[in-house]
Each structure stands twice: as structure tokens, then as C-alpha cells.
């Protein structure tokens, strides 16, 4: 069995976790109490081991299924909602780790003071869970860049996981600060510091920003004032599509290592852009054909992206198309050929093929009350493109505005952090921007050279 352990850190991580496990349970026919429902695959197969979902659930002697996940937060409020909510019986009490005081939106508190006191007990729970795995494949870490716990404790956890489980895959799902919408003033500080700290400890980071998700909910789902629950259920559909090939059988399955192999050309350039299609409300669903060609085309439209940036200005290095539901390889081939023939979608010249395809035959599951209509096929596109550097430069600019006046820095230094870490982190992000520039530049230079030769 190739097990995967999910770790949900801080408020964003925990709330996305709730939406993900709610969806996984629906997909696999597991009730909120952890026991299989009547139409569950367990009854069809007589054994969960025949099926891929043992990668995400472990089975107890009583026939109950327990998620392979850990919830971590420095304050108890958000996790208490899970402890008393509809899925309270799904999780083992030991899977919930809470502290007594929060990180106050301060990376240094999450990383150096409050978080440091808690990290060993978190790792002990992870160790116990890893011991129950026969062939641990890796970790999925869910957190936000902007909060204190998500950024500080998230970075510390990834550091320690890398030390103790260096050979295992480490994938992050991170809520990135939105361009206009902000949840705290010091978001740029926390984000730059956590990116610097995790750059060498994460194999692949899938980013989503709240503003892009708000826009998708408003435009595609006709939800006038989207709540975090709407956003999280949308993100859960994306996470489910990425992990579907680990949990279900399919003709072209993709495992954790394959994501890195196909999407990350250089170790530091590991931030794929995520796009999902179709996202339609129930009212619109009957009027759209959602053919393979159509949903593939929608993935290349900026308005379906989970991070605000313009892919038409950059170049694609690698693209992973993960289809699920009623999809046949021939249709996918036709869709990809038509995409390649477009002049607007440009690939770097050192990666001419550029497409990795995954097909999982399990259709997307509809969550009641999510606003997303039930569809018979969907696609999630993960693309490593140079245009995501736009997001980094936006973040760096906000950081510079505050740091030039040393605003709020004393709160971080007061928690035992060196002021030099700010400039070190900022330099690292400047280097990251340059890395993206160079990768795109190589192609530009070659093109100019070829044009000169033709002339």
C-alpha cells in the first residue's frame, strides 16, 4: 500500500481539511461516523485493500475507517468545531493537536516560540501514524502563507519532516495572499518568511489565492457573497482531483513522485498554477455540453485559475492534465493537439512535449449545498509557468513598502527572531524571481537567435 498522510496546519489548513475529508468520505461511501454506507465500495469489493483508498484511510478491527490525517493549531477554537461537528466520530481524538494561545498572525510566534513548544508532540503523532503504514509515500501539508500558525508552524513542520523523512515526497497546498483582499496587515512578511523557510523543504507547492476563488464563486456559481465554506469546497474539488489517481483505479494514474518528476524542471521552480474545470452552478449545468475539448480549453483561460496572474504573458514549462469521469484517451489526445496548435499558448523550447496526462474513471462527486453542480467529467490542470512570477513580484513589492519603514518588525524581533532574517528571506525571493526570469529568458534568446538565422 502506498499511504499518504495529510497534515492540516492553522485555521486555513484545518478548514480546507474539513472540506476535503467531507468530499473523500462522499467519494468512497464512508459515513460521518467512519463506517461504510450501504452503497460503499467496501461492500462491492469486500476489502478496502483491493481499492486505492487505503492510501488515505486506515481500517480498524471494528471495520471503521479513520483518515490518515493530523489537525494542528496553536489555539483550540477552529479544531473544537471539528471535535463537536458532524464528523466528530470520524477522527481519532489523538489526531487533533491544539495549543492554548495562538500565533497572533506572527510568523515568529508560530516558528520560534509558541510553535516550538508544540512541534515535538505533533511529530510524535505523525511518527505513530507513519508506523501504521506499510509503504508511506509522502505528506500533503495544508496551510496558509499569511497567518501566523500556517506560515510559522507550517515552515517548522516542513523543516522537521524533511529532516526525519527526507526521502518521502512533501507536497504543500498553500493559501497565497490575494492581490486586493487581505486578512492581516503583516501577510507579506509572513508569506516571504515562510516561502524562504520552505523553499528547500517542499517538493511541490500548489497555491490558491482567496481572491481568485471568490471571483470563480461569484462568476461561475452565481454566489453573490461567497463564504469560506464555499471557497473551501471549491478548493476541495481541486485537491480531490489531484489525489484521485492515488485513491482510485484508472488507466493513466499519477502518483506523488510523478507530480514532481513531470512538473518541476529545477528544484526551486516548484509552484505549479492550478486550474479546474468545469465549475458551474446547477442552473447552468443543463445548458453546457462539457465535452473534453471544452473543459480542456477552459483550463487555459485565466478566469478559471486559482491564483491571479496572466499565463498569456509567460511560458509553460510543463503541464499536467488530470481528467476524471467519462473520459477516453482519444478525446484527450484530440484536445491536447488542438491546444498545441494555438499560437497564444507558448512553451519553453527546451520542453517541447510538455503534457502529462492522468485519467481516473471515477466521476467528480457532488457535495450537497456547495453550489457546484454534479458533472460527469472534470479536469484539473497543473501547469508550471513563468507567469506565476507575477504573484511573487506583487508580494515582494508589498513587503518592500512595509520593510523600508521597518513597520511591525519589532513584533517579530520580540519573539526571538533576528532582523537579518527579513533581508535574507527577501533576497531569496528576489533570487526566485530571477530564476523564473532566466528560465523564460533562455527561450526568448533562442527564438531571437533562430529569427536572426532565418533572416
UniProtKB/Swiss-Prot annotation:
The record marks 455 as: Involved in polymerization. It comes from the Eukaryota. Signal peptide: none annotated. Coiled coil: none annotated. Its cofactor is Mg(2+). Mg(2+) binds at residue 75. Its main location: cytoplasm. The active site is at 258. GO terms for biological process: microtubule cytoskeleton organization; mitotic cell cycle; nuclear division; nuclear migration by microtubule mediated pushing forces. Its EC number is 3.6.5.-. It is found in: Cytoplasm, Cytoskeleton. Transmembrane segments: none annotated. Pfam families: Tubulin, Tubulin_C. GTP binds at residues 11, 75, 144, 148-149, 183, 210, 232. Tubulin is the major constituent of microtubules, a cylinder consisting of laterally associated linear protofilaments composed of alpha- and beta-tubulin heterodimers. Microtubules grow by the addition of GTP-tubulin dimers to the microtubule end, where a stabilizing cap forms. Below the cap, tubulin dimers are in GDP-bound state, owing to GTPase activity of alpha-tubulin. Belongs to the tubulin family. This is Tubulin alpha-1 chain. It comes from Schizosaccharomyces pombe (strain 972 / ATCC 24843).
Amino acid at each position: 500500500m502506498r499511504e499518504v498522510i495529510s497534515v492540516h496546519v492553522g485555521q486555513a489548513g484545518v478548514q480546507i481539511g474539513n472540506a476535503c475529508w467531507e468530499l473523500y468520505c462522499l467519494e468512497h461511501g464512508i459515513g460521518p461516523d467512519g463506517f461504510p454506507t450501504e452503497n460503499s465500495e467496501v461492500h462491492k469489493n469486500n476489502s478496502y485493500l483491493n481499492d486505492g483508498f487505503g492510501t488515505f484511510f486506515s481500517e480498524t478491527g471494528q471495520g471503521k475507517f479513520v483518515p490518515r490525517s493530523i489537525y494542528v493549531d496553536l489555539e483550540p477554537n477552529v479544531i473544537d468545531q471539528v471535535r463537536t461537528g458532524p464528523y466528530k466520530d470520524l477522527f481519532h481524538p489523538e489526531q487533533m493537536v491544539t495549543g492554548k494561545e495562538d500565533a497572533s498572525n506572527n510568523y515568529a510566534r508560530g516558528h520560534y516560540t509558541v510553535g516550538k513548544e508544540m512541534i515535538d508532540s505533533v511529530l510524535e503523532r505523525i511518527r505513530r501514524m507513519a508506523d501504521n503504514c506499510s509503504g508511506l509515500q509522502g505528506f500533503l501539508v495544508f496551510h496558509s502563507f499569511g497567518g501566523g500558525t500556517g506560515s510559522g508552524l507550517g515552515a517548522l513542520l516542513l523543516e522537521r519532516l524533511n529532516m526525519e523523512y527526507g526521502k518521502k515526497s512533501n507536497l504543500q497546498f498553500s493559501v497565497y495572499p490575494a492581490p486586493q483582499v487581505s486578512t492581516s496587515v503583516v501577510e507579506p512578511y509572513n508569506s516571504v518568511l515562510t516561502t524562504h523557510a520552505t523553499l528547500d523543504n517542499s517538493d511541490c507547492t500548489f497555491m490558491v489565492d482567496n481572491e481568485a476563488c471568490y471571483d470563480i464563486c461569484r462568476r461561475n456559481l452565481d454566489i453573490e457573497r461567497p463564504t469560506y465554506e464555499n471557497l473551501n469546497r471549491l478548493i476541495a474539488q481541486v485537491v480531490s482531483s489531484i489525489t484521485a489517481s492515488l485513491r482510485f483505479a484508472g488507466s493513466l494514474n499519477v502518483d506523488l513522485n510523478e507530480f514532481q518528476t513531470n512538473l518541476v524542471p529545477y528544484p526551486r521552480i516548484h509552484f505549479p498554477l492550478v486550474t479546474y474545470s468545469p465549475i458551474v452552478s446547477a442552473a447552468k449545468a443543463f445548458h453546457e455540453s462539457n465535452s473534453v475539448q471544452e473543459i480542456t480549453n477552459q483550463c487555459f483561460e485565466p478566469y478559471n485559475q486559482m491564483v491571479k496572474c496572466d499565463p498569456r504573458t509567460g511560458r509553460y514549462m510543463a503541464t499536467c492534465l488530470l481528467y476524471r469521469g467519462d473520459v477516453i484517451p482519444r478525446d484527450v489526445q484530440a484536445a491536447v493537439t488542438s491546444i498545441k496548435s494555438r499560437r497564444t499558448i507558448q512553451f519553453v523550447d527546451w520542453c517541447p512535449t510538455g503534457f502529462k496526462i492522468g485519467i481516473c474513471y471515477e466521476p467528480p462527486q457532488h457535495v450537497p449545498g456547495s453550489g457546484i453542480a454534479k458533472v460527469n467529467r472534470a479536469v484539473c490542470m497543473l501547469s508550471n509557468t513563468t507567469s506565476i512570477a507575477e504573484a511573487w513580484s506583487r508580494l515582494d513589492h508589498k513587503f518592500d513598502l512595509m520593510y523600508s519603514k521597518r513597520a511591525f518588525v519589532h513584533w517579530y524581533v520580540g519573539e526571538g527572531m533576528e532582523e537579518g532574517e527579513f533581508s535574507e528571506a527577501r533576497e531569496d525571493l528576489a533570487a526566485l524571481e530571477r530564476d523564473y526570469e532566466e528560465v523564460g529568458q533562455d527561450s526568448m534568446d533562442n527564438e531571437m537567435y533562430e529569427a536572426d538565422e532565418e533572416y
